[in-house]
């Protein structure tokens, strides 16, 4: 009897939630996820030692949310970008602001100047606002290819994902994910011209532009291939190719800006190399897999790639939608070519939010609840093991 009552209550709650407007559904799910995340941050804060980010004193809550790369964004708001690249004692380019994109710190800096509120307070607030907008955009995108209940479940999985804790910090992930979701929504609905400003702002927020350009190439070739079954009128041809070309240009705005301001053509590349000590193409994945798993490493890497392809193209990926599948492959190619596996890997997977629909395909409430509980536990580990700094130094999450 008790089990029936609990099941009835769960169904009633779900039905009530699904009767709300779409934006309200996303807001409720997002709000619950942020309450959980902020609670986890407050728990871990109790164990955070004083750091240089908090002037060698126990950090306040907002200072804690401003650790790691969030401090680089603050420096952009305070100092701008360097015109002369800083150098290490060995003569290599040192870590500097050029590795971080300007949109988030610019918005927060403007608000700080207008209101007088401290940057460290405003930055996570701005992140929360953009993350809410992202939740709404993602839910609308998911609903284009899945029923309302499973689309909402997928949205919940996105915002309970372990690295989604970063949406509550001074990082620019929330800003980038919002404009990415908006761009994909525009492309999926064939509103290519509306996607242009969204892609521009996305590329000013996060380095997603190269991956988006790969995606647009896949998308455009697919539109040509399928033009017999899906009409591809001249206006859509012109608009879609305009978006594709502009996507390539927007993707290099940050490197171009670094070149123009410093006078050094490879300023951006050398700045990126300051974090890893090198820049490689694809071989960095083989190197990392071998380092951690020995000769099993490349085999494990191949298995992961095959699982990704099967999960996306197989029956489990039926709710992802063609546009999101194309972006997932474009982004996966980008990661394999240019990204070096490190402590930031989970965070770099956030743009692949479409994969949440693989798990959301199940109609089992038990499976969904188990996934959300598991993600919550992993989020606590992400905050305590990666976000919390054990002085004197560490690696960014």
Predicted regions and their residues:
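Loop-to-helix entry region of an early transmembrane alpha helix in multi-pass inner-membrane enzymes
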Residues: 92-98, 102, 106, 114-133, ...
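Extracytosolic helix-loop segments that constitute the early lumenal/periplasmic catalytic or substrate-binding loops
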Residues: 53-60, 65-93
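Short acidic/glycine- and proline-prone juxtamembrane loop motifs at membrane-interface regions
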Residues: 169-175, 345
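Membrane-interface alpha helices of multi-pass inner-membrane proteins
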Residues: 180-185, 193-220, 246-250, 333-334
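Transmembrane-helix signature of polytopic, membrane-embedded enzymes
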Residues: 118-121, 139-160, 178, 326-328
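Membrane-interface transmembrane helices that cradle and orient dolichyl/undecaprenyl
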Residues: 146-148, 183-194, 363
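Membrane-lumen/periplasm interface segments of specific transmembrane helices
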Residues: 36-49, 213-318, 322-328
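Transmembrane-helix motifs of polytopic, lipid-linked glycan transferases
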Residues: 109-110, 122-145, 309-314
